[in-house]
Swiss-Prot record:
It comes from Xenopus tropicalis (Western clawed frog). GO terms for biological process: protein transport; vacuolar transport. Its main location: cytoplasm. Residues 28-153 form a coiled coil. This is Charged multivesicular body protein 5. It holds the Pfam family Snf7.
């Protein structure tokens, strides 16, 4: 069948704006190179004309320089046109890419909105409120347990004012306890005489009572 009707040629994909921009920029660079060569020729003819006297030879060189200059102007015009085309295509390409980016962003936002709707459907406000109530009840129970465990047994309530008054009085008592002057007074007091008043001794030096009988020492 291919021999009778021939084989169909593969379809060539259409060129994109990026390909067109690259092609135009390449042509513009090629023209720039041609302009550079023409500039070099103009410099050469200019130097020749400076060294030549007026006459047919100089006029001939001048005509060559004018032709080169005319070509240069034409190339410059072509280059400017290509640069403008490239700029316009770049602006168009930028606008297209911006629209694509915008569409991608909108599509992503739509997907996000759908996901959020699904997530909201799975979340029940009533369940959240019930859970909060349960947590609150458990915290209250925990506090009651802690209060029960820390309860004191048989400890009377103490007034803070009474404690402060006792503390102030305790300070005065401590100051009195620290005073040791009573010890000095006791040391300087006269000694207690031994024996009983009006006691006397016999000739042997033994204490006798008022009847002259020896006294029995206290045990």
């Amino acid at each position: 069948m291919n021999r009778l009707f021939g084989k169909s040629k593969p379809k060539v994909p259409p060129s994109t704006l990026t390909d067109c921009i690259s092609n135009v920029d390449s042509r513009s660079e090629s023209i720039d190179k041609k302009i550079s060569r023409l500039d070099a020729e103009l410099v050469k003819y200019k130097d020749q004309m400076k060294k030549m006297r007026e006459g047919p030879s100089k006029n001939m060189v001048k005509q060559k320089a004018l032709r080169v200059l005319k070509q240069k102007r034409m190339y410059e015009q072509q280059r400017d046109n290509l640069n403008q085309q490239s700029f316009n295509m770049e602006q168009t390409n930028y606008a297209i890419q911006s629209l694509k980016d915008t569409k991608t962003t909108v599509d992503a936002m739509k997907v996000g909105a759908k996901e959020m709707k699904k997530a909201y459907k799975q979340v029940k406000i009533d369940q959240i409120e019930d859970l909060q109530d349960q947590l609150e009840d458990m915290m209250e129970n925990a506090n009651e347990i802690q209060e029960a465990l820390s309860r004191s047994y048989g400890t009377p309530e103490i007034d803070e004012d009474d404690l402060e008054a006792e503390l102030d009085a305790l300070g005065d008592e401590l100051l009195l306890d620290d005073d040791t002057s009573y010890l000095d007074e006791a040391a300087s007091a006269p000694a207690i005489p031994e024996g009983v008043p009006n006691d006397s001794k016999n000739k042997d030096g033994v204490l006798v009572d008022e009847f002259g009988l020896p006294q029995i020492p206290a045990t």
